[in-house]
């Protein structure tokens, strides 16, 4: 959409007016006891709700004092390490089993898991001509926008879209979990064809394949993938499924659910939250940062040169001048992120299989150096370690997943957590979420038009 000269001048002028009138003195937040970002100075979130779905632990009580500990993550009370080890020992894919656990609170037996997989397969169908009429029309490079548009449009095909009974919401959630990968991959293919002039191919999912296998199958021209590729992607999905009720997109799920809104609107809102670069787009920043590092460091095996680049990042002298080392640190974890710890072993296997050992060694070096550099350069209130985003972008690049699908892959996993939290919010809370905002604007006398 083009803009007139008048429009451009107006926007430039009035944007400055907006900046002047929107700014609030930073000291007022501290003076009035406002928890910015709903977190205290140590990064601990304000207690806004209770949940049975997952638990994150980054500290423990020793001799009456709270001290940092290795990060722990529990899904429905089960340690994530044990869950991953459990399905890996059986040589099984974990997405469907852990989805069942998060939604229903119990680990399924063989009969229950078989039935659940059949239900997900039955739900893996889009309305007639939906791909052509909705997904492929007006293709966008931003696949998250494509997903949001598609999900809101799906509501038009649902005669009970606004019914928020448990049975209906569960049906809707299972359907959206099943079709979200299709909409994302088809959306990318549409963009790649109509914008990049590449070949267009639409592969239907195979009901006998796992979610990870189907994602790779639908994405690739020849539908081929190795077992290792599918298993590493499956692990990535499991590790990204759920992370408490306070992360931005899941809290959005609670907020919009509390208003009584329908499932399609709730998931669209969560997607809009996840789309933000401060939330779901972090792994893209890691990949871009690593590309910049390779351009600006002569010897990638030299720790001194790599450390110098990391310090430049913190001094806002490199990459995007934001002063951040992407993939390092987390709002909750300090000593370690268990998801990153689990993921690293699988990343290493894939890197060696793909001939990317040197790249893996570089990532490992940065994982070791960055916390030390940050501790030297910054005043920090807790430890810093690599988070799961640090390695996920590297994995997706090894799987030949395009950059446009990095955040949608996150969404394919996290929609499970959103669904579980929506069901929990509907069950337990009957009040709309409404935190307080205090006005710091002085009262003014009205000015007549001719006196302005």
What are these regions (language model features)?
Residues 1-452:
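Non-transmembrane, aqueous-exposed alpha-helical and coiled segments at domain scale
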């Amino acid at each position: 959409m083009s803009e007139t000269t008048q429009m451009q001048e107006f926007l430039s002028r009035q944007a400055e007016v907006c900046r002047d009138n929107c700014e609030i003195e930073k000291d007022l937040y501290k003076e009035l006891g406002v928890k910015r970002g709903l977190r205290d100075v140590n990064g601990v979130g304000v207690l806004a709700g209770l949940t049975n779905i997952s638990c994150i632990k980054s500290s423990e009580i020793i001799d009456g004092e709270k001290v940092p500990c290795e990060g722990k993550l529990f899904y429905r009370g089960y340690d994530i390490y044990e869950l991953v080890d459990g399905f890996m020992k059986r040589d099984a894919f974990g997405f469907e089993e852990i989805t069942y656990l998060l939604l229903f609170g119990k680990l399924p037996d063989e009969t229950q898991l078989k039935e659940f997989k059949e239900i997900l397969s039955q739900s893996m169908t889009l309305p007639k001509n939906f791909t052509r009429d909705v997904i492929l029309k007006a293709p966008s490079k931003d696949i998250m926008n494509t997903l949001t548009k598609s999900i809101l449009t799906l509501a038009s095909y649902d005669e009970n879209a606004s019914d928020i009974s448990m049975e209906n919401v569960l049906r809707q959630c299972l359907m959206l979990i099943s079709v979200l990968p299709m909409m994302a991959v088809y959306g990318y293919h549409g963009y790649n064809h109509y914008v990049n002039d590449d070949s267009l191919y639409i592969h239907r999912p195979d009901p006998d394949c796992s979610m990870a296998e189907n994602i790779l199958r639908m994405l690739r021209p020849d539908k081929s993938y190795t077992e290792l590729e599918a298993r590493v992607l499956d692990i990535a999905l499991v590790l990204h499924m759920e992370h408490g009720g306070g992360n931005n997109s899941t809290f959005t799920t609670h907020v919009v659910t509390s208003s009584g809104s329908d499932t399609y609107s709730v998931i669209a809102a969560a997607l809009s939250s996840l789309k933000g670069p401060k939330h779901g787009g972090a792994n893209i920043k890691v990949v871009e940062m690593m590309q910049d590092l390779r351009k600006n460091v002569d010897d990638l095996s030299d720790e001194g040169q790599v450390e110098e680049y990391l310090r430049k990042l913190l001094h806002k002298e490199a990459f995007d001048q934001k002063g951040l080392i992407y993939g390092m640190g987390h709002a909750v974890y300090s000593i370690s992120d268990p998801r990153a710890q689990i993921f690293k072993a699988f990343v290493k296997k894939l890197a060696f299989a793909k001939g990317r050992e040197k790249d893996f060694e570089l990532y490992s070096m940065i994982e070791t150096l960055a916390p030390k550099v940050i501790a030297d350069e910054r005043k920090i209130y807790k430890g810093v370690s690599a988070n799961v985003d640090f390695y996920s972008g590297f994995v997706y690049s090894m799987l030949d997943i395009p950059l446009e699908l990095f955040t949608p892959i996150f969404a394919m996993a996290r929609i499970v957590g959103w669904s579980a939290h929506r069901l929990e919010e509907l069950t337990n809370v009957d009040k709309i979420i409404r935190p307080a905002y205090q006005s710091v604007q002085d009262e003014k006398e009205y000015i007549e038009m001719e006196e302005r």
